[in-house]
Amino acid sequence: MSNRFAVILAAGKGTRMKSKLYKVLHPVCGKPMVQHVVDQVSQLGLQKLVTVVGHGAEMVQEQLGNVSEFALQAEQLGTAHAVDQAAGVLANEEGTTLVICGDTPLITAETMEALLQQHKEAGAMATVLTAYIEEPAGYGRIVRNENGHVEKIVEHKDANEKELAIKEINTGTYCFDNKALFASLSKVSNDNVQGEYYLPDVIEILKNEGHIVSAYQTEHFDETLGVNDRVALSQAEIIMKNRINRKNMVNGVTIIDPSNTYISADAIIGSDTVLHPGTIIEGNTVIGSDCEIGPHTVIRDSEIGDRTTIRQSTVHDSKLGTEVSVGPFAHIRPDSVIGDEVRVGNFVEIKKTVFGNRSKASHLSYIGDAQIGEDVNLGCGSITVNYDGKNKFKTVIGNGVFIGCNSNLVAPVTVEDGAYVAAGSTITENVPSKALSVARARQVNKEDYVDQLLNKKKS
C-alpha cells in the first residue's frame, strides 16, 4: 500500500454560525466537529495528517494535540490556497493525499477507505467523493465520460439544462496523487468573482493534462453534510444521535425512546442496560451491564458499575460501583467515588466524597468533602458542614456508624467505627469508636402551659 496522507481544512471563519466559538469546534453529540473528522481519518493508516487552521488556531491545536501537524492559513483565500499551506509538510512526499473539510463530522472511515480504494483501482491522479440526491440544487454536478471517469465538475450556476438534470453531486472531499496535487496548486488561478483559489480547479487542471479523474459515489449522502450554520449543526446532531443510538441498540442496549435519549459519541454502555426517556449520557462515560438509567437522568464523564440503577438524577465526573441505587432526584458531584451496593436516595447531594460499600444516605442529605466507611447509615437530614465561609474541611465517618436524623457534622470531625450519633445532634468534636454521641438541648415539658397562656391572653 502506498503512503497515505490527509489534509483537513479547518481555517474558515464560520461567519454564518454567528458565534464566538471557532466553527469546527462546535460540538456534535458532545465532540467537536473537527475531532470527529480526525478520529475517522486516523483509522486510515496515515503517514502524516495536516490540519490547516486559521482563526482560532490555538484552540484547534489544543483540541487535537499531537495527533496532527498544523499549517496556518493566515488569510482565507480559498480551498486550494488552504491546501497549499500544507506544502511545507507534504509537497515532497510520494503517495496519496485525502483532502476533507473539518466541518463534515458525519464522514466515516469506511467511506473514506472506499474512496481511496477507488482511486487506487482506477489508476487516477484525483478521485472525487460524490453522492446521488434527488434535489441537487446548489451543488456542483459530476459529468462522467463514456469510461465512467469524471469529465468535469460543473457548478450549479454554470450548468446547462442537460447538466442540471444530473443528480450526482460533488461533496467537496477528494483524494489526489500527492505530487500531482501540489504541482497543480501552483497553476490554480483566482480569476473569479470572489478572487479566491478553488480546489475543484485542480480537477480541471489534471483532466486537461490527460490524467484520469475518477469518482466514488457514496450511498450515504448524510455523511457528506457540511455544517455552516446552526440549522445544519442541528441536522448533524440528529443524524449522529440516531447513528450512536442504533449502534448501542445493535450491541444489546435497550433504549425505550431513541428520539428522547442522548448518548455522546465516546460513551460506552454494556449489554442489557436499559435507558429510559430523557436520559443524557455525556463525555467519556462508561456504563456497565444490566443497569437501569433514567428517566430524566444526566451522566457526564463518569464510570457506572454493573447492575446499578440511577433515576431522575445527575452524576458528574464520578465513579459508582456495582448494584448502586441512586435517586430519584439525587446529585452526585465531581470527584466522588461510590462503593458497591450503596443507596443514594432522593434529594441527596454528594460532592468529593468516598462512600463505602453497603452504606446509605436515603434522603435529604448533603455529604461533601467526606470519607464514609462501609455499612454506614446516614439518617434523613444528615449534613456534613464542610465550609466555614473561607475554607473546606473534611468529615471522616468510620465503618458501621449510625448517624441519626437531622444531624450536623461540623468539619473537621471524625466519627470512629461503630459509633452512634443521636438524632438532632450537632457534632463538633470527634466521636470515639462505639460511643453514643448526643449533642442537643435536653427536652423540657411545661405542664398545663398552654392553658395558662390562653387564660392570660383572655384576662
From Swiss-Prot:
One of its GO terms (cellular component) is cytoplasm. Keywords: Acyltransferase, Cell shape, Cell wall biogenesis/degradation, Cytoplasm, Magnesium, Metal-binding, Multifunctional enzyme, Nucleotidyltransferase, Peptidoglycan synthesis, Repeat, Transferase. GO terms for biological process: cell morphogenesis; cell wall organization; lipid A biosynthetic process; peptidoglycan biosynthetic process; regulation of cell shape; UDP-N-acetylglucosamine biosynthetic process. Binds 1 Mg(2+) ion per subunit. It catalyses: alpha-D-glucosamine 1-phosphate + acetyl-CoA = N-acetyl-alpha-D-glucosamine 1-phosphate + CoA + H(+); N-acetyl-alpha-D-glucosamine 1-phosphate + UTP + H(+) = UDP-N-acetyl-alpha-D-glucosamine + diphosphate. It comes from the Bacteria. PROSITE patterns: HEXAPEP_TRANSFERASES (PS00101). Signal peptide: none annotated. Pathway: Nucleotide-sugar biosynthesis; UDP-N-acetyl-alpha-D-glucosamine biosynthesis; N-acetyl-alpha-D-glucosamine 1-phosphate from alpha-D-glucosamine 6-phosphate (route II): step 2/2; Nucleotide-sugar biosynthesis; UDP-N-acetyl-alpha-D-glucosamine biosynthesis; UDP-N-acetyl-alpha-D-glucosamine from N-acetyl-alpha-D-glucosamine 1-phosphate: step 1/1; Bacterial outer membrane biogenesis; LPS lipid A biosynthesis. This is Bifunctional protein GlmU. It comes from Bacillus cereus (strain ZK / E33L). The gene is glmU.
